[in-house]
Amino acid sequence: MKKALALVVLVCSVWACEPRTDVVEGEIVQRMAHSDGALVAIVARANYGATVPYVYRVYLQSSDSSISAEILRADRLIDIYVEWEDNNTLVIRMRCGRIFKFKNFFYVTGTDGQLLAQIPVILDTEGLCDSESSF
């Protein structure tokens, strides 16, 4: 019960010190809910035209979709997906790609600004892709 209450508080205040948006940009290609359903990790793909590769973003979002925060932005990648390794760790797996933005942690704060939890984010990748023909 204590864990459930803590998670509810976590979701209600998860993005107190992070830039926020209520818009997930692009086509959603994967959703992975946290085991308790309070948080959702989202992989989205945006197409900006024929001369540039797809841009992929990973967001953490509250289950009611009221707020979301971008934690990864990359392009020229192969095979991206997300999974919850345990109750508090998000793993982003991609074979390779160019990474423009990545946060390896996510602070969860209360409405009063007090730190409630820190969610580690692990990026599992082999680095840059060998050839542009792979995309």
Task: Give residue spans per PLM region.
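Sec-dependent signal peptide hydrophobic core
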Residues: 5-9
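Surface loop/turn motifs at the tips and blade-to-blade linkers of beta-strand repeat domains
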Residues: 23-24, 72-74
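Acidic, small-residue rich beta-repeat scaffolds with periodic aromatic anchors
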Residues: 4, 74-135
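N-terminal secretory signal peptides
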Residues: 24-61
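C-terminal motif of bacterial Sec signal peptides marking the signal peptidase cleavage site
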Residues: 15-16
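Surface-exposed loop/turn elements that mediate protein-protein interactions on large endomembrane-trafficking
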Residues: 59-68, 111-114
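A beta-rich soluble binding module of mature secreted/lumenal proteins
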Residues: 27, 66-71
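Solvent-exposed coil/turn segments that connect beta secondary-structure elements
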Residues: 46, 63, 95-97
